[in-house]
């Protein structure tokens, strides 16, 4: 059985975000656990903090690198140097970080379960409708086959039967016709209900995606707040923590919540903005060229079905024109500029377009069969390349892939990254936070610095570094021994121009 949910872009986006949220939740729990043990181990000084730093480092190894994880890595290093922290710090951490985090994580877990249940419920509706269509189709095919057999029996035995026997067969044929029409209408209604259940499921995925995205933003903000609280308490301790705090301060000053949220959006983005909805098309007994039905009989039965589709297409087209007029009025009139009304109207437009595409695909398929029967060229339609078949035992099924825009706007990179004038300035700085351009300035490393990301430089005490760029968040960009990268400004001192020339010549 084909799964109608597998290739849905909405489903892929939601699952990707759900997986990302699970990793984020695990990371947040690891951080909370580390802070709790940090608070408990404060009274045991260096030994306890050393073990905790190792635990934190392991937790960070399985976490995606970003601003927050880098800052927490520096927090791990500060734990190694803060062996003399006393009980007051532990209580402050427990009260201001651990307790709020537990509350937020507990609330988010309940919300995520509720969102998952809602998605699963609507997904089951899509699958059930899909299965009902196939079941109704099989039933209609069998009834049509029996009806045709009875029809041919009546036609072939008109001359050999008495009037009474002939009337009996005609009554039986009439009942069979009524039953067939009822089953045909039931199958048609189930087929038409397919698009509404599909839309409901996709809309639920979209809404649940937005809700889960807000939870992730809240979690990132919580981690940032915890990190800032942690920094403030560390700053209260004396001269013994000065060197350690310099390191963690540099890392915290580099934290950019918006950058992490952008990373979240990029991590969960899909590769293609194209969304294809798969819908079953109505298949009829009359379409199969292998059945014993004659051509004229086929044509007489297909034409009413085609007429029904044409009437529905005309109605849907009129509805579309009306929606377009309303949408145009909303956009042009200031009194109707309500964003929610426009969003609702766009949703109705999307629903109408999907219904119209389904009707046109069904109409094209039946028109093509009728054209073959009447020995004339097949009609042309864009959906001809989007209709596919697959076989299941003795039956074949037809479905159409309808391309639709994703209503959820994922990454608006063009707007967020382009300059105000719309042109790329080749002479502009690669980062908006650059405060000055340093042309061949030199500086000397005062402390050893171990790089934690690929774009950072390793420094040894006494190294002479060429500075290319100074940034306001406390990090500079330079080169050392042929390698370029970032390094903390607090770890170096600038050399005067003359000293820099001497160091260069040496």
From Swiss-Prot:
GO terms under biological process: endocytosis; negative regulation of DNA-templated transcription; signal transduction
Chain ranges of the F-BAR domain: 1-260
A Pfam family that the UniProt record links to this protein: FCH
Domain SH3 residues, every copy: 438-497
Predominant localisation class: membrane
Induction and repression of expression: In F9 cells, by retinoic acid (at protein level).
Annotated signal peptide: none
Swiss-Prot/TrEMBL domain comment: The SH3 domain mediates interaction with NOS3, DNM2 and WASL.
Organism: Mus musculus
Coiled coil location: 160-230, 305-334
Protein name: Nostrin
GO molecular function: DNA binding
Keyword terms of this UniProt record: Cell membrane, Coiled coil, Cytoplasm, Cytoplasmic vesicle, Cytoskeleton, Endocytosis, Membrane, Nucleus, Phosphoprotein, SH3 domain
Gene: Nostrin
Bias kind Low complexity: ranges: 419-435
Cited InterPro entries: AH/BAR_dom_sf (IPR027267), F_BAR (IPR031160), FCH_dom (IPR001060), HR1_rho-bd (IPR011072), Nostrin_SH3 (IPR035656), SH3-like_dom_sf (IPR036028), SH3_domain (IPR001452)
């Amino acid at each position: 059985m084909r799964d109608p949910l597998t290739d849905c872009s909405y489903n892929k986006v939601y699952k990707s975000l759900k997986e990302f949220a699970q990793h984020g939740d695990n990371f947040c729990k690891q951080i909370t656990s580390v802070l709790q043990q940090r608070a408990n181990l404060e009274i045991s000084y260096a030994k306890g903090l050393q073990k905790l730093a190792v635990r934190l480092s392991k937790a960070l190894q399985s976490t995606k690198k970003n601003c927050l994880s880098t800052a927490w890595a520096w927090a791990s290093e500060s734990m190694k140097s803060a062996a003399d922290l006393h009980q007051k710090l532990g209580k402050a951490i427990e009260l201001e970080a651990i307790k709020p985090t537990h509350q937020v994580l507990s609330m988010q877990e309940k919300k995520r379960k509720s969102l998952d249940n809602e998605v699963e419920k609507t997904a089951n509706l899509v699958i059930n409708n899909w299965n009902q269509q196939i079941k109704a189709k099989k039933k209609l095919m069998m009834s049509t086959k029996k009806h045709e057999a009875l029809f041919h029996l009546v036609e072939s035995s008109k001359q050999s039967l008495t009037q009474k026997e002939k009337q009996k067969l005609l009554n039986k044929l009439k009942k069979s016709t009524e039953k067939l029409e009822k089953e045909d209408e039931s199958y048609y209604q189930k087929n038409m209900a397919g698009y509404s259940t599909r839309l409901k499921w996709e809309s639920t995925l979209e809404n649940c995606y937005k809700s889960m995205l807000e939870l992730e933003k809240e979690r990132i903000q919580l981690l940032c707040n915890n990190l800032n609280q942690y920094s403030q308490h560390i700053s209260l301790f004396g001269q013994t923590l000065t060197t350690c705090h310099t390191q963690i301060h540099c890392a915290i000053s580099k934290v950019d919540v918006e950058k992490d949220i952008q990373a979240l959006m990029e991590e969960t983005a899909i590769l293609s903005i194209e969304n294809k909805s798969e819908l079953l098309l109505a298949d009829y007994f009359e379409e199969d060229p292998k059945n014993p039905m004659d051509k004229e009989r086929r044509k007489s039965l297909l034409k009413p079905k085609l007429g029904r589709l044409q009437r529905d297409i005309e109605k849907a087209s009129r509805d579309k024109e009306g929606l377009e007029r309303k949408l145009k009025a909303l956009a042009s009139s200031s009194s109707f500029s309500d964003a929610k009304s426009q969003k609702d109207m766009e949703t109705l437009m999307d629903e109408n377009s999907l219904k119209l595409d389904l009707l046109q695909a069904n109409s094209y398929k039946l028109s093509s069969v009728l054209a073959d029967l009447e020995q004339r060229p097949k009609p042309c339609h864009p959906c001809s390349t989007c209709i596919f078949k697959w076989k299941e035992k003795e039956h074949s099924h037809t479905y159409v892939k309808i391309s639709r825009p994703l209503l959820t706007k994922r990454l608006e990179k063009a707007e967020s990254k382009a300059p105000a004038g719309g042109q790329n300035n080749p002479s502009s700085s690669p980062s908006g936070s650059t405060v000055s351009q340093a042309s061949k300035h030199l500086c000397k490393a005062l402390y050893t610095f171990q790089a934690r990301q690929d774009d950072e430089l390793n420094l040894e005490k006494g190294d002479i570094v060429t500075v290319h760029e100074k940034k306001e968040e406390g990090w500079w960009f330079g080169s050392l021994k042929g390698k370029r990268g970032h390094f903390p400004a607090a770890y170096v001192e600038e050399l005067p121009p003359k000293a820099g020339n001497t160091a260069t010549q040496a």
